[in-house]
């Protein structure tokens, strides 16, 4: 079976279903990673499990990130009539612990290092992620025309509003002036004029963590959402519903995990 050919057919189906460009891009990248891994190997359940274990042990992958890969792969396997290859997803709480959380001191060390190195774009990315709780993929909604105290974020077919603090608002406007950005994306690859690949941002922040002597395991795809959530709950400890709304969680129970993290931190201080 030619998996690359099947992938093209699968992507065509996703386009017919009017999936967003970001979703299709993610599907293609994730399935391509699996195809690369399987080269020279037999396509069977054992190989899929080995790939799953590989994802589960890489520093930058937490359970929810690994599950994103597995859900996409399972969908692809069903498309090619290989349901026998489908694997179980990982329980979210398995690795969602304080061990992988970004502390306030870590966050501010990253900011100081980005500023010290003159990395204006990394500094701005850190400020946006840490102060709004958006996903890295949602940076594309930060456009010159949209800069305001309240901004709309659309993801997974849902729209939500986020608040932008005045000092961050000023920083965004100053950045645009200094870099002569008059319209469109604020954070973008200067070579392609398009959004940075998510993996590029992860790598850059990991590298920055090394420079700042911050544990790289604490700088993962959702580290800054976790950080924002815990800071929010320190200020509004009983407003889990409000936090769920800001983060775009459909269930309050999903946001409740951050309460557990905050309680764990309190226990460590005793």
Describe the role of every protein-language-model region.
Residues 1-270:
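Conserved catalytic core of the tyrosine transesterase superfamily
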């Amino acid at each position: 079976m030619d998996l690359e050919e099947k992938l093209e057919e699968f992507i065509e189906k996703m386009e017919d279903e009017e999936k967003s460009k970001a979703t299709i891009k993610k599907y293609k990248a994730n399935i391509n990673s699996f195809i690369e891994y399987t080269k020279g190997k037999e396509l069977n359940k054992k190989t899929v499990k080995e790939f799953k274990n590989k994802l589960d042990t890489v520093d930058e992958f937490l359970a929810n990130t690994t599950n994103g890969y597995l859900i996409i792969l399972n969908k692809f396997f069903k498309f090619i009539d290989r349901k026998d290859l489908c694997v179980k997803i990982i329980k979210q709480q398995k690795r969602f612990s304080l061990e992988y959380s970004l502390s306030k001191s870590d966050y501010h060390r990253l900011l100081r290092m980005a500023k010290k190195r003159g990395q204006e774009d990394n500094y701005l990315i850190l400020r946006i992620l840490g102060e709004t709780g958006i996903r890295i993929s949602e940076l594309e909604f930060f456009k010159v025309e949209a800069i305001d105290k309240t901004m709309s974020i659309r993801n997974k077919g849902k729209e939500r509003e986020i608040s932008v603090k005045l000092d961050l608002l000023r920083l965004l406007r100053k950045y645009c002036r200094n870099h002569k950005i008059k319209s469109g994306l604020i954070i973008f690859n200067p070579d392609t004029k398009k959004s940075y690949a998510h993996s590029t941002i992860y790598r850059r922040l990991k590298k920055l963590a090394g420079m700042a002597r911050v544990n790289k395991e604490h700088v993962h795809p959702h580290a800054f959402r976790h950080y924002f959530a815990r800071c929010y709950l320190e200020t509004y400890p009983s407003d889990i519903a409000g936090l769920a709304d800001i983060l775009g969680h459909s269930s309050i129970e999903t946001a409740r995990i951050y309460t557990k993290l905050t309680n764990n931190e309190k226990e460590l201080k005793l």
